[in-house]
């Protein structure tokens, strides 16, 4: 009994080792793995086992060369070859990588399935264990946030379209006590498109409501301001001197009422004065001081108190004109006080001539996960950085003068010591 258990455990271990190495050299990982692609170019595709055991997930399974070789010999895929010296492996030249054209990408979509409902604390091994009796799977993508936190959902790629269709026939699945959401990739994108349309419609309605409320608040504020100023307008008209100015009006009322604004242009025959106080009081005081004969620059003037709707319209126009004038003046003041650099050149001008570093630009991978737009650094770049960090394990010392390597404890779970890789690429 114990002997049979040991054999089963050994068989399971060999299967995991073989699957892991075949994943590294497989159709989904190899095109994205810059480090491994570089190694392949060095020796006609051969990669030393000494290099392979520095890959994180494989090193957790075994670092023994003989164990690796024995596991690979049991493989039925014929994907990998072992060299005569039994110290290197490579992808078989008889099984070249597929061409990454539209036809191939479409075939992947038809074999892809979206599954949601895993706890965010789940790891790749948990997911693989749950999937092990659900059909032959080529690739598992653990979907993550920009902060590398698991979202609780995955994309899996089956070996064939039929395998994916068979899996989709039974969608009443559970992970422990969690009900799972299962969709084909086409259904997933259709669902996301509908959600985006709905969100866009909701945002549009929300924006419209916000604008409507803002407009109402502005109108209420304006109405309140107008109501507060009722009784403060005084209209004047007549055969005015062409040289009459606003300064003349200020001089006329300076001891009788504070003037806030005058709507008048030199040469005009009428205008309106906005007082900070009641216009009738100011007019009565000015008339009393001038024997009830209030002239403007020696000319007879008709003075009128504006009332009712006419007053409200005039107040609205004057207050708008006052605000517009204030905004223009503020803009001129802002330009006026811009600093000058040496040589009399403005600092803003000189700064435009200098090229400034604006930080690392980020691109977004929108090929399949348009809804998530996960931040994307080249997966090849992430992989080579990861393998560089793995260079000190198993006695392999860093090259003289090379930068200090990170500890292998920083390695991620989905490849050879991945350094905070930005995009999830076939976690296996």
From Swiss-Prot:
Q: Which UniProt keywords apply?
A: Nucleus, Phosphoprotein, RNA-binding
HTH La-type RNA-binding domain span: 7-99
Keyword RNA-binding attached:
yes
Where in the sequence does UniProt note compositional bias of the Basic and acidic residues kind?
406-428
Biased composition of type Basic residues is found at: 328-343, 352-361
SUPFAM superfamilies assigned to the protein according to its UniProt record, in alphabetical order = RNA-binding domain, RBD, Winged helix' DNA-binding domain
Region annotated Disordered sits at 187-223, 323-428
- Biased composition annotated in UniProt, kind: Acidic residues: 366-377
Motif Nuclear localization signal at which residues? 196-212, 316-332
Q: Where, per UniProt, does this protein localize?
A: Nucleus
What are its GO cellular component terms? cytoplasmic stress granule; cytosol; nucleus; ribonucleoprotein complex
Per UniProt, residues of the RRM domain are: 111-203
Under the heading Pfam families, the entry gives: La (PF05383), RRM_1 (PF00076), RRM_3 (PF08777)
Q: Name one GO biological process term.
A: tRNA processing
Functional note: La protein plays a role in the transcription of RNA polymerase III. It is most probably a transcription termination factor. Binds to the 3' termini of virtually all nascent polymerase III transcripts.
Identification of the protein by name: Lupus La protein homolog A
Where does this protein come from, organism-wise?
Xenopus laevis (African clawed frog)
The taxonomic lineage of its organism, from the top, reads:
Eukaryota, Metazoa, Chordata, Craniata, Vertebrata
């Amino acid at each position: 009994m114990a002997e049979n258990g040991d054999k089963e455990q050994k068989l399971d271990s060999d299967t995991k080792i073989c699957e892991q190495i075949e994943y590294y050299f497989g159709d989904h990982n190899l095109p994205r793995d810059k480090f491994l692609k570089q190694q392949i170019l060095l020796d006609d595709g051969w990669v030393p086992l000494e290099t392979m055991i520095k890959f994180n997930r494989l090193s957790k399974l075994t670092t023994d060369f003989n164990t690796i070789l024995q596991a690979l010999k049991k493989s039925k895929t014929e994907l990998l070859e072992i060299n005569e010296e039994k110290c290197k492996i490579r992808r078989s030249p008889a099984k070249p990588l597929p061409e990454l054209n539209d036809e191939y990408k479409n075939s992947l979509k038809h074999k892809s399935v979206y599954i949601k409902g895993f706890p965010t604390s789940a790891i790749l091994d948990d997911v693989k264990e749950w999937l092990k009796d659900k059909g032959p799977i080529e690739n598992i993508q653990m979907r993550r946030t920009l902060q590398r936190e698991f979202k609780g959902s995955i994309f899996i790629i089956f070996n064939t379209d039929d395998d994916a269709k068979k899996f989709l026939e039974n969608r009443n699945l559970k992970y422990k006590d969690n009900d799972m959401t299962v969709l084909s990739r086409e259904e997933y994108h259709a669902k996301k498109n509908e959600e985006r349309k709905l969100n866009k419609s909701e945002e549009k309605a929300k924006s419209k409501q916000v604008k409507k409320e803002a407009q109402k608040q502005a109108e209420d504020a304006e109405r309140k301001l107008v109501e507060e100023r009722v009784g403060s307008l005084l209209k004047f008209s007549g055969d005015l001197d062409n040289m009459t100015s606003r300064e003349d009006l200020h001089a006329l009322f300076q001891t009788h009422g504070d003037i806030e604004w005058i709507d008048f242009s030199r040469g005009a025959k009428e205008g309106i004065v906005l007082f900070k106080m009641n216009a009738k009081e100011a007019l009565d005081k000015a008339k009393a001081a001038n024997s009830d004969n209030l002239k403007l620059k020696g000319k007879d003037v008709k003075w009128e108190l504006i009332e009712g709707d006419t007053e409200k319209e005039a107040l609205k126009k004057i207050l708008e004109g006052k605000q517009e004038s204030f905004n223009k003046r503020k803009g001129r003041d802002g330009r006026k006080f811009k600093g000058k650099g040496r040589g009399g050149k403005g600092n803003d001008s000189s700064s435009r001539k200098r090229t400034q570093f604006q930080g690392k630009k980020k691109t977004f991978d929108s090929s399949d996960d348009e809804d998530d737009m996960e931040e994307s650094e080249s997966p090849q770049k992430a992989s080579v950085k990861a393998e560089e960090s793995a260079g000190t394990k198993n006695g392999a010392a860093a090259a003289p003068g090379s930068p200090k390597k990170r500890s292998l404890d920083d390695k991620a779970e989905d490849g050879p010591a991945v350094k905070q890789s930005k995009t999830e690429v076939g976690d296996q």
